[in-house]
UniProtKB/Swiss-Prot annotation:
It catalyses: N-(5-phospho-beta-D-ribosyl)anthranilate = 1-(2-carboxyphenylamino)-1-deoxy-D-ribulose 5-phosphate. InterPro entries: Aldolase_TIM, PRAI_dom, RibuloseP-bd_barrel, TrpF_fam. GO terms for biological process: L-tryptophan biosynthetic process. Transmembrane segments: none annotated. HAMAP family: PRAI. SUPFAM superfamilies: Ribulose-phoshate binding barrel. It comes from Methanothermobacter marburgensis (strain ATCC BAA-927 / DSM 2133 / JCM 14651 / NBRC 100331 / OCM 82 / Marburg). It comes from the Archaea. Keywords: Amino-acid biosynthesis, Aromatic amino acid biosynthesis, Isomerase, Tryptophan biosynthesis. Its EC number is 5.3.1.24. The lineage of its organism: Archaea, Methanobacteriati, Methanobacteriota, Methanomada group, Methanobacteria. Pathway: Amino-acid biosynthesis; L-tryptophan biosynthesis; L-tryptophan from chorismate: step 3/5. This is N-(5'-phosphoribosyl)anthranilate isomerase. Belongs to the TrpF family. One of its GO terms (molecular function) is phosphoribosylanthranilate isomerase activity.
Length: 226
């Protein structure tokens, strides 16, 4: 099981997340987000960590803008937000020859309607995030475990090779109380649950989280295939 720290906006938080052993570090380029960063800032912060750890979160559906973001940041792992599976497939067709990694965020709910009839062509992973009040993620709300498990089973049945990440308001307390449940996922995505304010990570919470995670049996070998 891998750990992703997302919504990073400060140099000191990036450096700490990397040093604590987080596998993936996410930088958000979406203007509606309180953690939005301009591409120049993303490039500066992501330069502090190994290339394979950086993830660029974007909600644009325009391939040209995605290519611009890749060119300006140097990040080759892209997380698509507020984009349909069909659109993600078209983006993949445009980027495939370049060898970039695409992951797609699914807002929960709705549930099975997200994936029925879709093949997720070219998508290497899916991120389950909570939807609320018209927002398709970034709500800071926990996904009901029954909903997430329903989607996980459907995804596993369709394509066992797809990496499935659980996001949505995750905290250390929740992980401790639901250890068996969260261990079913390939990756856990932490953002608001380890913050004192939007984009401001709590260093004590981060350290406590990573210390706990490193002791889990499912954590063994997590970095072997990022």
């Amino acid at each position: 099981m891998k750990i992703k720290i997302c919504g990073l906006t400060r140099e000191e938080d990036v450096v700490l997340a990397d040093s604590l052993g987080a596998d993936l570090l996410g930088f958000i380029h979406a203007r509606r987000s309180p953690r939005h960063l301009e591409l120049g800032d993303v490039a500066e912060l992501s330069s502090l960590i190994p290339d394979e750890k950086a993830v660029l979160v974007t909600e644009t559906s325009e391939t040209s803008r995605i290519m611009e973001a890749i060119d300006k940041t140097g990040i080759e792992r892209i997380q698509l937000h507020s984009v349909s599976p069909e659109t993600a497939g078209k983006i993949h067709e445009s980027l495939h020859a370049e060898g970039y990694s695409l992951e797609l965020t699914l807002a929960v709910p709705p549930l099975s309607s997200h994936i029925c009839g879709h093949e997720f062509q070219g998508i290497s992973g899916l991120i389950l995030d909570s939807a609320s009040g018209g927002r398709t993620g970034g709500t800071g709300k926990i996904i009901p475990p029954s909903d997430a498990l329903e989607l996980l089973a459907l995804i596993r049945g369709m394509d066992p090779s797809l990496r499935v990440t659980l996001a949505g308001g995750l905290t250390l307390e929740f992980v401790r109380k639901n250890r068996e449940y969260v261990s079913k996922f390939d990756c856990l995505d932490f953002n608001s649950g380890i913050e004192t304010g939007p984009g401001v990570k709590d260093h004590e919470m981060m350290a406590e989280l990573m210390n706990y995670i490193e002791g889990l049996p499912t954590r063994k070998g997590a970095i072997e295939e990022i």
